């Protein structure tokens, strides 16, 4: 079997495991790159942008539970089964910013969506917020699931600190990722409690390992991702979202933020959310970086109420 077939086999096992069967299609961006999207459910569209070095299937448990919503799970360029970024990897922060500024609108054009709600997490939040600021009329609402790149950090996972060392990124993408290494990386970035509780279970770990082993997701995304921290100056302040940019996001924004997110927890959330014109913050106790894995019921209920109105049947 080819690498793509081996990856698809693991992905299909995961979807069966969560009891869902998404449809799949590819759309073409203006630069000619093909982007894979999976769709699940009926209702108003909800475009979901995943975090770093992962793909759209990372939303599987949330999407399977969001009744009344048409979830559109996107593999960002270079991730999952989407084409790499044309002329990538992106080697400097200005190039990353240009890519983030243009991707969301380009994607919505390809999806033929004039306006939609957007959900995001981590690196996906950087794309969601910067892209929305570029064309706010295209986004009706945003749900941000915990900390996003562009927000301040009050702590930095060990993997991020190591990645900031010169030459480390190139080394990381050359090393084979064992199942154990995948688990440890996920734990570092804030999925430890979900793994310990079994909400990120063996089928999900097998899928994540297959993604690292049988696709170029890790290489493509690591080499095109900005440094959240720098070896000398600490947090990369040039990456932070400015008040001027955030002021352009006048649509309702819901933050479902893990209180114990190792990238930036409750204190960061309470300082960051009020910087947006119309933001609601829900801090989820004992949740980490992927709050829908730690407390699915709360994330589903709050998301449906926010997208469908207070009368949503929860």
Predicted regions and their residues:
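Conserved HGGG/HGGXW glycine-rich cap/lid loop of the alpha/beta-hydrolase fold
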Residues: 33-84
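Conserved alpha/beta-hydrolase catalytic His-Asp/Glu region
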Residues: 153-157, 176-247
């Amino acid at each position: 079997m080819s690498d793509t077939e081996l990856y698809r086999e693991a992905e299909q096992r995961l979807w069966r495991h969560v009891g869902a069967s998404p449809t799949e299609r590819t759309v073409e961006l203006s630069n000619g790159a093909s982007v894979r999207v999976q769709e699940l459910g009926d209702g108003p569209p909800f475009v979901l942008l995943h975090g770093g070095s992962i793909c759209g299937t990372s939303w599987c448990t949330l999407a399977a539970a969001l009744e009344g919503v048409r979830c559109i799970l996107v593999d960002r360029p270079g991730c999952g089964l989407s084409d790499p970024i044309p002329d990538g990897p992106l080697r400097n922060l200005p190039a990353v910013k240009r890519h983030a500024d243009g991707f969301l609108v380009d994607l919505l054009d390809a999806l033929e969506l004039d306006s939609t709600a957007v959900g995001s997490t981590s690196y996906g939040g950087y794309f969601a917020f910067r892209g929305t600021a570029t064309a706010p009329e295209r986004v009706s609402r945003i749900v941000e699931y915990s900390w996003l790149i562009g927000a301040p950090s009050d702590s930095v996972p060990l993997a991020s600190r190591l990645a900031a060392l010169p030459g480390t990124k190139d080394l990381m993408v050359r090393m084979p990722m064992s199942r154990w290494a995948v688990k440890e990386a996920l734990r570092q970035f804030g999925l430890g409690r979900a793994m310990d509780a079994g909400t990120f279970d063996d089928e999900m770990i097998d899928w994540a390992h297959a993604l690292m082993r049988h696709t170029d997701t890790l290489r493509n995304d690591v080499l095109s991702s900005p440094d959240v921290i720098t070896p000398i100056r600490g947090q990369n302040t040039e990456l932070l979202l400015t008040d001027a940019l955030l002021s352009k996001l006048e649509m309702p924004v819901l933050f479902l933020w893990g209180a114990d997110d190792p990238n930036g927890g409750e204190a960061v959330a309470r300082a960051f959310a009020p910087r947006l014109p119309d933001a609601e913050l829900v801090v989820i106790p004992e949740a980490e970086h992927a709050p829908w894995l730690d407390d699915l019921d709360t994330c589903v209920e709050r998301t449906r109420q926010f997208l469908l109105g207070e009368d949503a049947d929860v």
